[in-house]
């Protein structure tokens, strides 16, 4: 029996790692895989199961932090991590002053974090209490899918900036607003912010990079805060489940993020939107047709 429960923890960690940063909604997948199928509260208890989900989400967050570690070092440290200054040349061929190239800074990330940070502090308990249900998640999945389709179709009419270092503070703030909207479960943080990024004339890779770089600090803070609030529900007997789930989420998070970043400029958003619509149909059949998940 213990082996079966450890296998369930492994599966949940894999699902979390694969879906947390893809624009497919990790919440929707957790409802399908855990709430409707594996039912972690049955072997962990309801509060401990919630803590387990926080722990495996941290695995995904650390995976993203590892992938973008050089970017964070560049934003936080000086020295070899800072881009070198370059000399400018005037029209008459004379060498002018040395200037540093434009680049993404910590201030861009902080500006992007402001909307979701404020909304999370004010309404986190309300969102958790009233919006975490199967019907509301299905609504979020559908709305997010339609927004992704709109973003891809509408943005095809203009050229996109190729480099994340060209992002402006205004773009960062607007993308941050969309991250706040994505606090509706099922909408998908990455789906919302990448879509907004391409609408703001960023290319898909640059929008994805900024999405992940911006998400790590706020997700890390939110996860650690939730973990502190629920620390009393961690039991020594559950530690193996936490370790397996965390490691699975970290490893598969690394694979998922790297694969996604390599593909996003080619496949764009519509394939993910179609997948989300199919997922909604599947969940709806289980929920309305067979009553699976009615107690969620």
UniProtKB/Swiss-Prot annotation:
It is a multi-pass membrane protein. It comes from the Bacteria. It catalyses: di-trans,octa-cis-undecaprenyl diphosphate + H2O = di-trans,octa-cis-undecaprenyl phosphate + phosphate + H(+). One of its GO terms (molecular function) is undecaprenyl-diphosphatase activity. The chain crosses the membrane at residues 48-68, 104-124, 131-151, 167-187, 208-228, 237-257, 272-292. Its EC number is 3.6.1.27. GO terms for cellular component: plasma membrane. It is an enzyme of class 3 (hydrolase). One of its GO terms (biological process) is regulation of cell shape. It is found in: Cell membrane. Keywords: Antibiotic resistance, Cell membrane, Cell shape, Cell wall biogenesis/degradation, Hydrolase, Membrane, Peptidoglycan synthesis, Transmembrane, Transmembrane helix. Catalyzes the dephosphorylation of undecaprenyl diphosphate (UPP). Confers resistance to bacitracin. NCBIfam families: PRK00281.1-4, undec_PP_bacA. Bacitracin is thought to be involved in the inhibition of peptidoglycan synthesis by sequestering undecaprenyl diphosphate, thereby reducing the pool of lipid carrier available. Belongs to the UppP family. This is Undecaprenyl-diphosphatase. It comes from Staphylococcus carnosus (strain TM300).
């Amino acid at each position: 029996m213990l082996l079966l429960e450890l296998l369930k923890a492994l599966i949940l960690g894999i699902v979390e790692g694969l879906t947390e940063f893809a624009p497919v909604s990790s919440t929707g997948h957790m409802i399908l895989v855990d709430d409707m199928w594996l039912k972690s509260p049955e072997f962990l208890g309801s509060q401990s199961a919630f803590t387990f989900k926080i722990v495996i989400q941290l695995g995904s967050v650390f995976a993203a932090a590892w992938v973008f570690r050089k970017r964070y070092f560049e934003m936080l440290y000086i020295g070899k991590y800072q881009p070198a200054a370059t000399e400018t040349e005037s029209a008459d061929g004379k060498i002018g002053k040395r200037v540093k190239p434009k680049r993404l800074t910590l201030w861009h990330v902080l500006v992007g974090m402001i909307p979701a940070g404020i909304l999370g502090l004010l309404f986190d308990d309300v969102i958790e209490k009233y919006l975490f249900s199967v019907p509301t998640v299905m609504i979020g999945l559908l709305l997010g899918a339609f927004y992704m389709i709109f973003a891809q179709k509408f943005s095809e009419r203009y050229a996109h900036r190729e480099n994340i270092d060209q992002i402006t503070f205004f773009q960062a703030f607007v993308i941050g607003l969309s991250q706040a909207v994505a606090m509706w479960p099922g909408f998908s943080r990455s789906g919302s912010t990448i879509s907004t990024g391409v609408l703001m004339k960023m290319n898909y890779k640059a929008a994805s990079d900024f999405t992940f770089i911006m998400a790590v600090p706020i997700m890390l803070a939110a996860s650690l805060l939730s973990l502190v609030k629920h620390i009393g529900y961690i039991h020594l007997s559950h530690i193996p489940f936490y370790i397996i789930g965390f490691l699975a989420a970290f490893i598969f998070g690394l694979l998922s993020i790297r694969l996604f970043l390599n593909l996003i400029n080619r496949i764009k958003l519509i394939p993910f939107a179609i997948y989300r619509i199919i997922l909604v149909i599947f969940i709806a059949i289980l929920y309305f047709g067979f009553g699976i998940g009615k107690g969620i």
